[in-house]
Amino acid sequence: MKKFTAALCTVLLLIGAVLVPGAAAAGPALANTRAYCIMDADTGLVLAQQNMDEELHPASITKVMTLGLACEKAQGDWDDVKLTVSHEDVYSLAGTDSSHIALLEGEEVPLVDALYATQMASANDGANLLAEYFGGGTIADGVAAMNAQVEELGLAHTHFSNPHGISDEDHYTSCYDMAQILRWALQQPGFEDLFTRNEMYTMQPTNIQPVTRYFSQQDKIRIGSSRYHIDSVLGSKLGYTNTARYSYVCLAEQDGVRLICATMQSQLSTDKYNDMRTLLDYAFSTYKSYTQLPGGTVTAQLAVAGGGQSLGTVTVADPGVKLLLAEGLSAQDVTVDLELPEQYLLGAEPAVYAVYTLNGGAQQESTSVRVKAEITGLAELLEQSVGTKLEAARDVEPGSSAWLLAGISVGCTIGAAVVTVLVLRVHSRLKKRRKTARHHKKA
């Protein structure tokens, strides 16, 4: 593995990136809440934390993942989808004394109703119904999808055994992981509208249930007349079991700064509210604006091979990004390393990363993040090599389908490979545009 380092760089935490906590923790010390994590919602940078990687019982904040996967599958089509309540949705909760909306076996429920019931009423039967929906079968299939998403996000301290959060020894997460789960969920179509709704929701009678059901959010921080009200909190999810105690995760915004804050194992309900105020007051007084830092502060050349022969080199660089820095810190307090393999083999996923390290000292959490680096010059390299024959690429490891197609070269010329790569790059850009459109659609 090659390493290239620069003293001036940027910090970026993407979904799936790995964070390594620094030695010194910035931020308030909480006595009545076991763990917390304050994160920049835009970049994923951890701003302050306490025991953020400790594995704890999440209770109903589990439903952030459940709702996120349901929104991802629906792609904004909430009104035309109806779900049928199964026997397991209802009777698997028998004896748990858990929150529910009295769904009945065989009841036909619009997806939109199941979403708001799960978010606002914290309905465990609603969460079961959604798990069957995005899992494509049983509740267990939904739980498997939840854990698959955890793996895709690269989260090391989370495992789910149910979609609702009833405490179980094999059901746990951490404040850092939960903040990242919410950050991912906020990118799914419609999730932010769901997560931030304050108005009462009305569920009309169904084919079996003649009663109209009403859901209202119960977070006192978001109730204007409450002594615990905080203007900056836009959306939230609460959790409680005897084992987990009180958990809380929220999205907050003030003067253009968007934060995610997760707390776990608050001893009392009042601790949950008071500690959240302490954390947000600290965060918004410390981090007031973003600093835009350019990319390309460190670059390196990476050898490219395909069909058993060397094709040349491409350029790898770190991306540019905006980040929140505490007063007294600047880009000079951040370093970047590029991690590269000895060569990039066509047909395999390019394993190129930028590792950014912030030395926050006493002012800010010291962290490192590992993200995908940018590769440029691949198409140009192949164009320059037109006419060179590639031998059968027996040494190519399977990667993503797009890159695998780029590496298939038996009996082909590099000219054909150029066309393939260019087509795939257009396809990739279209996918990115669709993802961007979905991201902006949430507002």
At which residue positions do the language-model features occur?
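Sec-dependent N-terminal signal peptides of Gram-positive bacterial secreted proteins and lipoproteins
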Residues: 3-25, 406-425
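Hydrophobic alpha-helical membrane-insertion segments
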Residues: 11-12, 49, 72, 248
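Catalytic-site microenvironment of enzymes
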Residues: 47, 431-432
